[in-house]
């Protein structure tokens, strides 16, 4: 009898152990070593996020924020907001801590001097923070090079500033915006991009704001630096192979911190049978500076030159550029004698940007010519 009771007790104990073991959760059975490994992975993930660069995206509108389900040429620019742009490229979170601000949301033909000042001041303020490693500005491509060059001359920081756009609206088939935006964030977060001035990133290419220009109305590879070349390319990694020798960003003499407006500078275009009256009209309209897009080496017809000289005598600064799209405009002959300045290698639209800023400091033609030779 005692033996039977003893056997029953052993059987009951065994069954109890079996059921208790089966009811344990996987977590309860996890060894201390496994727990340590799990915590280590979680900690590494948080550490990775903290190690990523912090990039601020400032959106201004343009095609990259445009909408059209099928057309790549007929669409409404400046419709999609910055948060939607960021959400459309979730992969950016793997390479940077990204957040956005909507500065304006317009087609880039509507970017005016007021917007340039607002954007430039905001970029400067953000980059003055130790918590921000780089800036990306989304922008319409039509005037992108002008904004990029403005930032190149006015932001006093060696942290990366990247201006990006797209040639196809964000909702179109084969939109180039998401890839361009991802690459822009990648470049803005790269240590190697520091000190290179404002950069323009599209189509897997990195260009300097000083030299790049839009060359085609619809092609995705429209932005080129014909004479100087790109300064880098983007593949799995970022490859820089060129340096900028012109003054820019932190070495620039120009400051917009106390400015609430910029001088009026107009662009006139040279052609056969042009006249002097356009110079008179610009002066009458309040121009403080005029950029003349001349033929060849910034050439003016006799009639146009008379108008330019009259403008100079009335205190208006006149700079000769070229309509050819490339090459250096040189100082020579009667042009120098008449204080008709040369834009060096700046195209008319960028010459206008530099002349506006130059006129905030001086109206001395010799000093302004020095600016064009240095910047």
Residue ranges and their predicted role:
Residues 43-44, 49, 277, 302-375:
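ATP/nucleoside-binding phosphotransfer catalytic cores, i.e., glycine-rich phosphate-binding loops
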Residues 148-178, 185-189, 313-322:
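Short, acidic/small-residue loops that bind anionic groups at enzyme active sites
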Residues 1-10:
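Bacterial N-terminal signal peptides that target proteins for export
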Residues 164-235:
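Internal gly/pro-rich beta-alpha loop/helix module
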Residues 137-159, 300-309:
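Short Gly/Thr/Asp-enriched flexible loops that form oxyanion-binding sites at enzyme active sites
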Residues 52, 58, 65-68, 81, ...:
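Accessory alpha-helical/coil subdomains and C-terminal extensions
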Residues 34-35, 39-124, 306:
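ATP/NTP phosphate-donor binding region
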